[in-house]
Amino acid sequence: MSKILFFSPCSLFSHTMNKNSRLHTNSNIGNTFFSEIGIGITGNSFLLLYHILKFIRGHRPRLTDLPIGLLSLIHLLMLLVAAFIATDIFISRRGWDDIICKFLVYLYRVLRGLSLCTTSMLSVLQAIILSPRSSCLSKFKHISLHHILCAILFLSVLYMLISSQLLVSIIATPNLTTNDLTYVTQSCSILPLSYLVESINSTLLAIREYFLISLMFLSTWYIVALLCMHRKQTQHLQETRLSLKKSPEQSATQTILMLMTFFVLMTIYDNIVSCLRTMLLNDPTSYSIELFMIHIYATVSPFVFMSNEKHIVNFLRSMGKRMINLNLH
């Protein structure tokens, strides 16, 4: 299942789960996972609603507003699909047919790819925003939302094509016991692929992942370098209250830097643990830990973004004060 839902550069399908090692026997793991999913769905729904209302009210959008809103939508859909799939892992066999299995796993793969792509795009856009006028990136500062949407649409189609082999390899688990199938959930399995097809697909996924992560790393390094240069240039200024106050751009930059670093670290962790689990610890418990860890970014990211939005922070503070006052009275 790991290489269908949570793809790493290791062997394409690394989790072989037989019928005697079902994860639904451990209710604590399932409850923890569904709690994480619930928190993530709440946070992404709130962030998406905020950006929709912001657009309806006619606020001038920042260059990063569209990717952030899109990322919240992607994570919301991804977590919903993950929760639906998880019911067939932790709870009971639903008896899904081929169409449901193919649709859910294929949709999840595409959403995971779009999450990686949008996160990478967000880091690049932030680097463009901070780039000085003398930089070659400054000419992209006036890029329109139309171009961003076209890029996202192109990448969406590309990911759909790359993942299209899942529409063939994913099937409903037959009643006949066989050792040739890799179990994705209790209802869905993977048909064995030829060595050539598996190698090509693994190579394409690895190239895509390494390219986008490298792009995030370079843009993050560029942002850090710009911030260090800016700090050196302002060191000679007198340390007044005004100079110590963070600008909105600096706050947004620090937020995105933190998320990019967290995303890269979680991706590296997923790759390492997935490879080790494939070679050494191919058991349900280690798999369930990985299942929990790789959704942390989608769960945490909306709250990090919202912490940088003054309107949301002020709204939550006022709501908190009202609840405290109601409890006191």
From Swiss-Prot:
Putative pheromone receptor implicated in the regulation of social and reproductive behavior. GO terms for biological process: response to pheromone; sensory perception of chemical stimulus. Glycans are attached at residues 175, 201. The chain crosses the membrane at residues 33-53, 66-86, 110-130, 148-168, 210-230, 256-276, 286-306. Keywords: Cell membrane, Disulfide bond, G-protein coupled receptor, Glycoprotein, Membrane, Pheromone response, Receptor, Transducer, Transmembrane, Transmembrane helix. CDD domains: 7tm_V1R_pheromone (cd13949). This is Vomeronasal type-1 receptor 43. PANTHER family: VOMERONASAL TYPE-1 RECEPTOR. One of its GO terms (molecular function) is pheromone receptor activity. SUPFAM superfamilies: Family A G protein-coupled receptor-like (SSF81321). The keyword Glycoprotein applies. Residues 1-32, 87-109, 169-209, 277-285 are extracellular. It is found in: Cell membrane. Belongs to the G-protein coupled receptor 1 family. Pfam families: V1R (PF03402). InterPro entries: GPCR_Rhodpsn_7TM, Vmron_rcpt_1. It is a multi-pass membrane protein. The keyword RNA-binding does not apply. It comes from the Eukaryota. Disruption phenotype: Mice lacking all but one V1ra and V1rb gene (12% of the V1r repertoire) show a lack of chemosensory response to a subset of known pheromonal ligands and changes in maternal aggression as well as male reproductive behavior. Disulfide bonds join 101-188. Residues 54-65, 131-147, 231-255, 307-329 are cytoplasmic. GO terms for cellular component: plasma membrane.
